[in-house]
């Protein structure tokens, strides 16, 4: 009798345990696949939907332990081994309250988890010092239970949540590592979250958008080459497709590749820690009408199989499945046949409404469903009632003192003038309202209904902000290259009456002397020397009672000059900046007045001028309108006279460069080539000998002006300016 009772009680305990295990869910399969960048995915399958596990990481030995609450194990093989550089073995064990997976690694690693239906995806990659936690004492994991042993020792290790971004332990570890790292995860709103840790960077990052890329730049923060990495996160089904961390000169760039419609939320958790949340744009559930954009359904999956059932009954079932409060209008009627399997409940509701031309308006967890025309009529009546109330409501007055904008700028924005400042002249002010401006106090005075005043408040909050500033640095280089060569001759003769017993003499120098006799000088001496000869040779030869002198002179010069100017100017966005360097030349101007003439002196500029107007685009580019003029004094012929004039050269252009890029403006180039020849008529034309009766000159001058313009956007909330 006792034996039978014992067997019955044992059977009840076994059945109860089996029922509890079945109701909680069991691990049925484990599969491993590879991703780029040495990343692994462990896909754990369950026989029903489960929750995200908790776990912890140990570095010695390198393991990842995951605990699944109220979960059993239903696998034939509970120890899986792999010949992989990162993952070596997976062991599964369970006790009365939970199941544990222990992932043995060949090197320290880190992980992230994601629940997908009845599967848990575990993403594993090599550990980075920035996000590991060496400051925390290592936790030694309990060994996995053998394959035949279903009950394991109680789990006593501390459990760490895997979704907590930048815990104090992580920050402390990253501070000791002095490195830069990125991490990616997905939240419950289907948003991609990128966490950036940049130790040693104390400023704010520059964020810009280029098409489907978000570019985050950390200025003057150098990234080691070994830390450059790229994450392909397209499988997470978020707006983020790829995350790249790379080095660009002395800067660090984080490039987020996106798809579809999204919005960016930037958060700073601590100095050097930044979180970027890329959210899919919310769909307006309260708007009616046809929307051709693809819809996203996130409700719990259900199965429906009805034939010729009242629509109101289907709505009642959907209300129970979704937990929403659905209120159906009296106009909702009819029957329909419906057969759906594993479809989100919100998609099933959308199909029912489309089939019967219904629409909905949602407020909190209450959904009002009615025919589309009926809801549109209610919306129209509501808006008309609001308009009637606004036309009859009280008027209020509000003063807005502007901080950064000039109140006169709002005159053109609101289309105001002194003759009419009522709502007939602009779109914001109602028919009974008015707007006044006070330039003395830079104040805008608005008199209108509360709703209009609130619109003004929002408009002023958006427009009355500090203008972005641009530091424009110009490098002006003027290079000159000159060459000149001159060759001349001086030819003549002197003589005296020859004395008895004298012989001819030879000597150097034009003034070589001869003694005795009466001197004579040739009247046809050739004098074609170089103006400023570098060298000359004089020859004197006695001929009978005279002498022939010949002086050859030559000059050659080579010049190279370079002038460099480096002016800088700070200007606001879309405001003109001007840099000038040069002279003011006085000119005498004669004017007729009364019966005589009066003379006045006027100053004219002869300058090298640079005028730049920057325009910052929404994606961080800079469009620059550039005007360059180079004026210099010159001599101009006026009849038989030479007067002072100004030579002018100018250049106008518009170009777009990135922030910190350089625009090169050239094309102002001059080259002067000249050859001169002075000779004695007839004698200078004689071949060979004619060179003694000529002076030749050759001159070449080249000048080129190059201007390098580098704009940089200044962070108005950042550090002080540096020149």
UniProtKB/Swiss-Prot annotation:
Q: Which InterPro entries match?
A: AMIN_dom, GspD/PilQ, NolW-like, NolW-like_sf, Pilus_4_PilQ, Secretin/TonB_short_N, T2SS/T3SS_dom, T2SS_GspD_CS
SMART domains xrefs: STN
Q: Which domain of life is it from?
A: Bacteria
The consequence of inactivating this gene is: Cells show decreased piliation and transformation efficiency. It uses hemoglobin as a heme and iron source in the absence of a hemoglobin receptor and it has elevated sensitivities to various antimicrobial compounds.
Biological process GO annotation list?
A: establishment of competence for transformation; protein secretion
A Pfam family for this UniProt protein? Secretin
Tell where it localizes: Cell outer membrane
Gene3D superfamilies the record matches: 2.60.40.3470, 2.60.40.3500, 3.30.1370.120, 3.30.1370.130
Major subcellular location class: membrane
Ordered alphabetically, the record's keywords are:
Cell outer membrane, Competence, Membrane, Protein transport, Signal, Transport
GO CC annotation terms, alphabetical: cell outer membrane
**Signal peptide location in the record?**
1-24
Role this protein plays: Required for type IV pilus biogenesis and competence. Could function as a pore for exit of the pilus but also as a channel for entry of heme and antimicrobial agents and uptake of transforming DNA.
* Oligomeric and partner information: Homododecamer. Tetramer of trimer.
Task: Tell me its family.
Answer: Belongs to the bacterial secretin family. PilQ subfamily.
What protein name is recorded for this chain? Type IV pilus biogenesis and competence protein PilQ
Recall the taxonomic lineage recorded for the source organism: Bacteria, Pseudomonadati, Pseudomonadota, Betaproteobacteria, Neisseriales
């Amino acid at each position: 009798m006792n034996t039978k009772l014992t067997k019955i009680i044992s059977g009840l305990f076994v059945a109860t345990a089996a029922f509890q295990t079945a109701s909680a869910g069991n691990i049925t399969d484990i599969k491993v696949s590879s991703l780029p960048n040495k990343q692994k995915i462990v896909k754990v399958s369950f026989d029903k939907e489960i929750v995200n596990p908790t776990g912890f990481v140990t570095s010695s030995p390198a393991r990842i332990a995951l605990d699944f609450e109220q979960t059993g194990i239903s696998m034939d093989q509970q120890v899986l081994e792999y010949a992989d550089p990162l993952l070596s073995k997976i062991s599964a064990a369970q006790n009365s309250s939970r199941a544990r997976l222990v992932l043995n690694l060949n090197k320290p690693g880190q992980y992230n988890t994601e629940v997908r239906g009845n599967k848990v995806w575990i993403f594993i990659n090599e550990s980075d010092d920035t996000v590991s936690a060496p400051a925390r004492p290592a936790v030694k994991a309990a060994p996995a239970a053998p394959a035949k042993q279903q009950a394991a020792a109680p789990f006593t290790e501390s459990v760490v949540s895997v979704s907590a971004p930048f815990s104090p332990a992580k920050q402390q570890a990253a501070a000791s590592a002095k490195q830069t790292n990125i991490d990616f995860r997905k939240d419950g709103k289907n948003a991609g979250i990128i966490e950036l840790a940049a130790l040693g960077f104390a400023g704010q990052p520059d964020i810009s958008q280029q098409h489907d890329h978000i570019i985050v730049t950390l200025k003057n923060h150098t990234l080691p080459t070994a830390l450059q990495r790229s994450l392909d996160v397209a499988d997470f089904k978020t707006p983020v497709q790829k995350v790249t961390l790379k080095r660009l000169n002395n800067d660090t760039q984080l490039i987020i590749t996106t798809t579809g419609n999204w919005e960016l939320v930037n958060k700073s958790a601590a100095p050097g820690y930044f979180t970027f949340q890329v959210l899919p744009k919310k769909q307006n559930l309260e708007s009616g009408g046809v929307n051709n954009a693809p819809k996203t359904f996130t409700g719990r999956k259900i199965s429906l199989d009805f034939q010729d059932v009242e629509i109101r009954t289907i709505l009642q079932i959907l209300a129970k499945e979704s937990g929403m409060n659905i209120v159906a209008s009296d106009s909702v009627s009819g029957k329909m046949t419906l057969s759906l399997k594993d479809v989100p409940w919100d998609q099933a509701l959308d199909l029912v409404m489309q089939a019967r031309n219904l629409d909905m308006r949602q407020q909190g967890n209450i959904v009002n469903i009615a025919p589309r025309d009926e809801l549109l009529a209610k919306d129209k009546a509501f808006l008309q009632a609001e308009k009637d109330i606004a036309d009859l409501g009280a008027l209020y007055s509000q003063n807005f003192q502007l901080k950064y904008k000039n109140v006169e700028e709002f005159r053109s924005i609101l289309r105001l003038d002194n003759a009419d400042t009522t709502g007939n002249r602009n779109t914001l002010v109602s028919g009974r309202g008015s707007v006044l401006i006070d330039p003395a106090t830079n104040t805008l005075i608005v008199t209108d209904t509360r709703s209009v005043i609130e619109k003004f408040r929002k408009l002023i909050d958006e427009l009355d902000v500090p203008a972005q500033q641009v530091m424009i640095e110009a490098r002006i280089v003027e290079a000159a290259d000159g060459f000149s060569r001159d060759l001349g001759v001086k030819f003549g003769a002197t003589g005296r009456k020859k004395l008895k017993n004298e012989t001819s003499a030879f000597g150097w120098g034009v003034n070589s002397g001869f003694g005795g006799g009466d001197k004579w000088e040739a009247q046809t001496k050739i004098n074609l020397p170089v103006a400023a000869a570098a060298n000359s040779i004089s020859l004197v030869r006695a001929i009978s009672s005279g002498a022939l002198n010949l002086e050859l002179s030559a000059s050659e010069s080579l010049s190279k000059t370079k002038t460099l100017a480096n002016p800088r100017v700070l200007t606001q966005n879309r405001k003109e900046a001007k840099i000038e360097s040069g002279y003011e030349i006085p000119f005498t101007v004669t004017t007729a007045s009364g019966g005589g003439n009066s003379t006045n002196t006027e100053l004219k500029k002869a300058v090298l001028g640079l005028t730049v107007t920057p325009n910052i685009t929404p994606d961080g580019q800079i469009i620059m309108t550039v005007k360059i003029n180079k004026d210099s004094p010159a001599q101009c012929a006026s009849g038989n006279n030479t007067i002072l004039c100004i030579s002018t050269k100018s250049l106008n252009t518009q170009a777009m460069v990135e922030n910190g890029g350089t625009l090169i403006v050239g094309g102002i180039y001059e080259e002067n080539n000249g050859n001169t020849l002075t000779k004695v008529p007839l004698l200078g034309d004689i071949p060979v000998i004619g060179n003694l009766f000529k002076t030749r000159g050759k001159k070449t001058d080249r000048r080129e002006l190059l201007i390098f313009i580098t704009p940089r956007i200044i962070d108005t909330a950042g550090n002080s300016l540096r020149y």
